[in-house]
Amino acid sequence: MGRAIGIDLGTTNSCVAIQGKIIENKEGARTTPSVVAFTSSGERLIGAPAKRQATTNASNTFFATKRLIGRQYGDPEMKDLNVPYKVFAAKNGDAWIKTTDGKEYSPSQIGAFILQNLKEAAEAYLGEEVKDAVITVPAYFNDSQRQATKDAGKIAGLNVLRIVNEPTAAALAYGLDKKHGHTIVVYDLGGGTFDVSILEIGDGVFEVKATNGDTHLGGEDFDNAIVSYLLDEFKKSNGIGLKNDPMAMQRIKEAAEKAKIELSSAMETEINLPFITADANGPKHLNMKLTRAKLESLVNDLIERTMTPCKKALEDTGLSANQIGEVVLVGGMTRMPRVIEKVKEFFGKDPHRGVNPDEVVAIGAAIQAGIVQGDVRDVLLLDVTPLSLGIETLGGVFTPLIERNTTIPTKKSQVFSTAEDNQTAVTIKVHQGERKLAVDNKLLGQFSLEGIPPAPRGIPQIEVTFDIDANGIVHVSAKDKATGKEQKIRIQSSGGLSESEINRMIREAEEKAQEDEKRKKFVEVKNQADSLVHSTEKSLKEYGDKVSPEDKSAIENAVNELKEASKSDNIDDVDSIQQKITNLSQLSMKLGETIYKESQQQQGKESSAGSSTTNEEEKVVDSDYQDIDNKEENK
């Protein structure tokens, strides 16, 4: 069995680790922006290179796609989405994204591209192929979102050993060396989601007692609050709205994120965006100051929203805030001073800040990978399901079978009956949530059990069994106890990716990887061509008069041909460019021979001159020495 990695697939940034060590990416950074872009030439960019070109390619630069993963286009959260790229409803109702040239991608595919990039970084570090991984998800992710994340891993060519909750992973990294039992809270405010988990840890046992959260609350919302403020202020000052200008919006978003980060350490920052737009009177510039106090007033409601899940989690455990031993902060947004203050006010103690909030989840995932593979021993992890799971019963009532905060894996059965006389089939609708009516909860999927013998209503006995595995993914079965007929399914909602779609995306990912390798070779060959042209032109300038006119002309023609070929952006021209490099290299050999001879002759002259000088110096020294001796003798 090969070594397994731990991956934190984040909304804003992602991170990969192995055996408690963070692996740097190709750019040498410890975290990778969760950004994927497609250029006009068809090149796919991931991470920092994708983020750098976002201003000029906003419609084809996809960020924060974790907020779309496992979601239907009609979900309420989609209304607040503030992104410059096209989001549309796929055939199955899922939220997908589209490039300006019409190419369609599922959020799982975009996640897979990021996972592939992290996988390659790990392989470069380890010097071997990596197949197995543990991937983290927000604790409050529902079944559809967990399944979509697992699909992303599969598309990326990874065997997903386990899907683990982010706060639980953070607790593993924090508490692995803690021997004495105590209760901790993990407050995880990331780029797109918020989770809070309460755990009891000690002697290698990590038991989650309760978890709560909001899968649509994070740093992106803080950025959007600043963006809205800047847009309003600019419109007041200049009378111009910028919402419909993608390039201006991207510049403002980047400036907002930068200002937010700066105000974690400074009391005031200046946002300066020259030439943001223009009107009949000329160019307009966005220039304004933002104080920490103003930022806090803009995002105060968002910070307050994190307190409600904290209260619910405490209520579910029956604990009070003063019974919490430690509060561990996770996620980049927990660097904000006002967030730290609010957590301190609520729990009545200074939060623990001894872990890196950007890296601790990936480290915990790597530890979990070690546990699954048997490399890390004497550690027991007991996680919970974040949401109640049940079925729709008569009158549209939601009947839970497994309550929220039940330790997983778990299995629960309950017997139901028919609602009408002589009913020969029942449809089982599976929901997840906390509302009383089924329609108000998330419909995970439905299936039918047919062939029930006709009987008065209430007589048939249909046993419905729910099974939640260690990944938090749901499996359901229904059995007619009279006939023994059984129907088993792994929940797959009306949305979600089918097996054939996943296989198609795996093939596309493999093809794209081959294309990326081809493009990499193309760039390397073009760089080689540029270098050869430069060195040859320099040599021609210095030594062109030393070769025959015919040879000089042939070399100049070969240089021009290579220059022209190098202008191509078609990766299929790589062999043609390589051929012209070989041709120029062979022709340049005569020029190289001339340079070598010239160099040898020059060295010979210097050596001869040096030898003559040495002899003369020796004679002079001898003469002087003799004179001195004579003088000494005459004394």
UniProtKB/Swiss-Prot annotation:
| Classification via InterPro entries | ATPase_NBD (IPR043129), Chaperone_DnaK (IPR012725), Heat_shock_70_CS (IPR018181), HSP70_C_sf (IPR029048), HSP70_peptide-bd_sf (IPR029047), Hsp_70_fam (IPR013126)
The answer to keyword Transmembrane applying to this record is: no
Induction details:
By stress conditions e.g. heat shock.
Phosphothreonine-modified residues are 193
Keywords (alphabetical) are: ATP-binding, Chaperone, Nucleotide-binding, Phosphoprotein, Stress response
Identify the stretch(es) annotated as Disordered: 533-552, 595-635
The family assignment reads: Belongs to the heat shock protein 70 family.
Function, please? Acts as a chaperone.
Protein's UniProt name = Chaperone protein DnaK
Protein source organism: Wolbachia sp. subsp. Brugia malayi (strain TRS)
